Amino acid sequence: MKFAVIVFPGSNCDVDMFHAIKDELGEEVDYVWHDTENLDEYDAILLPGGFSYGDYLRCGAISRFANAMKAVQKAAEQGKPILGVCNGFQILVESGLLPGALMRNENLKFMCRTVQLRVENNETMFTSQYEKDEVINIPIAHGEGNYYCDEETLKKLEENNQIAFRYVENPNGSVSDIAGIVNEKGNVLGMMPHPERAVDELLGGAEGLKVFQSILKQWRETYVVNA
């Protein structure tokens, strides 16, 4: 399986994402600059955290216009797994690939610590290796991670089982404690916590690795078993 880590000016979690795939998952991965127009050779696309374009205007508001995002849109339409973490989640929302918005944290402060998440849906291509309602420890590092959507959108997310993760103790004011959501098709996940920072027991825990293992399992079942 071959992954692409999209690198925008200001990305700073791309190395962590690359390490998670190459060294922990053991799969092929490339850094792909934001001006690329073709992602056809990749089986999964990863949008890392950071401060793309300095977070000017709004987080992710400029990155949505990058050439690579047109290719990401195409990959999403093809059903390829797309994972956006932190700033990557913000970019997915700004691009219209996921509903809602990310606002300033309720306390107006940047937050950097490990939090507990509850797995709300383990039937997605990103969460199949977790148990339903499993509580996992994953780091957060954001100033604008307060997820917001209107009541109609929230109702739709809940009815369609699109809420992948919730905070056990809400750190930022996100509506309904939401930490991560998938699109209706189930192949695009956006989450504020950083699973790529929780892939090595030596560095404090590996409870985020199952996100990437789930992607790999889905790909193998779809393309290797049926080959």
Curated annotation (Swiss-Prot):
GO cellular component: cytoplasm
Keyword annotations from UniProtKB, A to Z: ATP-binding, Cytoplasm, Glutamine amidotransferase, Hydrolase, Ligase, Nucleotide-binding, Purine biosynthesis
Predominant location: cytoplasm
Pfam families associated with the record: GATase_5
EC numbers, comma separated: 6.3.5.3, 3.5.1.2
Biological pathway: Purine metabolism; IMP biosynthesis via de novo pathway; 5-amino-1-(5-phospho-D-ribosyl)imidazole from N(2)-formyl-N(1)-(5-phospho-D-ribosyl)glycinamide: step 1/2
Record GO biological process: 'de novo' IMP biosynthetic process
PROSITE patterns: GATASE_TYPE_1 (PS51273)
Taxonomic superkingdom: Bacteria
Subcellular location: Cytoplasm
Hydrolase as UniProt keyword: yes
Subunit structure: Part of the FGAM synthase complex composed of 1 PurL, 1 PurQ and 2 PurS subunits.
Role description: Part of the phosphoribosylformylglycinamidine synthase complex involved in the purines biosynthetic pathway. Catalyzes the ATP-dependent conversion of formylglycinamide ribonucleotide (FGAR) and glutamine to yield formylglycinamidine ribonucleotide (FGAM) and glutamate. The FGAM synthase complex is composed of three subunits. PurQ produces an ammonia molecule by converting glutamine to glutamate. PurL transfers the ammonia molecule to FGAR to form FGAM in an ATP-dependent manner.
PANTHER family, sorted: PHOSPHORIBOSYLFORMYLGLYCINAMIDINE SYNTHASE SUBUNIT PURQ (PTHR47552:SF1)
Protein name per the record: Phosphoribosylformylglycinamidine synthase subunit PurQ
Species name: Bacillus cereus (strain Q1)
